[in-house]
UniProtKB/Swiss-Prot annotation:
Function: Produces ATP from ADP in the presence of a proton gradient across the membrane. The gamma chain is believed to be important in regulating ATPase activity and the flow of protons through the CF(0) complex.
Source organism of this protein record: Ehrlichia chaffeensis (strain ATCC CRL-10679 / Arkansas)
Entry protein name: ATP synthase gamma chain
A Pfam family the protein falls into: ATP-synt
Record-level GO BP terms: proton motive force-driven plasma membrane ATP synthesis
Main localization category: membrane
Family (UniProt): Belongs to the ATPase gamma chain family.
Amino acid sequence: MANLKALLLRIKSVKSIQKTTKVMQMISAAKLHRVQQKLENAKKHLLELSSIVDYVPSDGVHNCASIAKKERVLLVVMSSDRGLCGNFNNLIVKFTKSYVEKLESSNKEVKLIFFGKKAYDMMYSQYSDKILNVFSNTKSITDFLYFKLFVYNSGIDFDQFDNVMILFNKFYTTILQKPDAQQLIPCNLGIPMLLKEVYQYEPTYVDVLSTISLGYVLNLMYIAFLENSASEHCSRMVAMESANRNTKDMLNRLALEYNRSRQASITTDLIEIISGFESLN
């Protein structure tokens, strides 16, 4: 009887877990859909910025992609604040470690900034001397405006570095996400030397280009952030789907074990009743 009660408690517990994983899977699917819409809009915005740059003359403008020597490198690492998303964070941590080793082998000074605390927690013990800061609570970023405020309030000074890279899990499809690196600074805008038309700029085209370049870099960061968020939600959705399947298999095994134990208990009770009846006769 005690064994049957224990099995019933396990079945109840697994059913509760199954409900939780199912809800988390549905929530992740809904969040993934919203992030995909934001990602599509952000890419359109980046395309518009790129087209504007095509009309800015480059004579006399310092090209931000013409830095000859790169000595100090900042890696902005995107991860998640929460777990239960498969190997999502493990992939970006492994990719970051490999990237750091490659840069240091080229005699570069590497510093790290983390968006999302999971990768930070996994790398702190080994790279504590290279970490400048970590920013958690990234779920509060709901749109591009909040993202800009988040970056400004973070106090990141890109001017201290010759090269700034952002490392994130790039979203390709719902079944394919891979770690990727995107260069932020120098920002390769690809400004043409000759233009078909000439425009006048206020106050100067240097200021115009500077403003556009800043917007371009922020937009690249925002797209990487959205790509990483989409990959996180997709990984969590797949992980919860797998967990849901496992709970179904476990429930089937527990139900079979419960029925066998119950049948054995009933058989034992019947044998005892028959034996008692025979002893009375």
